Amino acid sequence: MIKTKVLQAWMGIWLCAVNGLLGSDQDCSDRDPTGSRCSISVEKLLDRAIQHAELIYRISDEARTLFEEMFIPLLIPAHQVHGGNSCTSNLVRVPISKLEIQQISDKWLLHSISILVQVWIEPLADLQDSLDMYDNVPSSLISKTRWMSTKLMNLKQGVLVLMSKMLDEGSVELENNESMLRHIVAPAMAEHVLRDYAVLSCFKKDAHKMETFLKLLRCRQTDNPTCSLF
């Protein structure tokens, strides 16, 4: 019994302390008599997750633009440096029609967000290591990539809590150690530079998916029949 109470207390502390996403202890609106349970509404959690996703997308766009200005030579034809064309992953397909959007479940949305977050943790860490080998890399670019990695980890924890609250389940396990890196194709010319550019471009694209899916989930909490991805 004592061990169970201790475990419950630690779980309550963890839920209240996920940095930057779940907010401060003052946001805990409901507690059990022991003071160990911290309850934040799904709506508040989604609002904070959306804020994180919006910032991640914005900073990813800034980092990509800065990298392009600094390291992509003007002599390379535009069609060779368009990073979006190098994103070959079909891990998460965005529904197109209104009927598809209406048919997808909250579970599908949360699982998709969880997958997108997980597959990008390793590539962003590798990108930081790669940038350390560049000459005259702007400190602002290093800061932005580190910031994205940190916020992505925060978003991962927030999504886990949302899955626990909304679906009563834990994390989604990736099959066969799925990695986004093997889905990114870099041209032979200046391969490492264009590969890093492709990583930034593809991450920006998937960061927008995360933001869009979270906003759809938030809209559904209001029972709005017109919720859409577009």
Curated annotation (Swiss-Prot):
Keywords: Disulfide bond, Glycoprotein, Hormone, Secreted, Signal. Residues 1-23 form the signal peptide. Transmembrane segments: none annotated. Its main location: secreted. Disulfide bonds join C28-C38, C87-C202, C219-C227. One of its GO terms (biological process) is response to nutrient levels. Coiled coil: none annotated. Belongs to the somatotropin/prolactin family. This is Somatolactin. It comes from Ictalurus punctatus. The lineage of its organism: Eukaryota, Metazoa, Chordata, Craniata, Vertebrata.
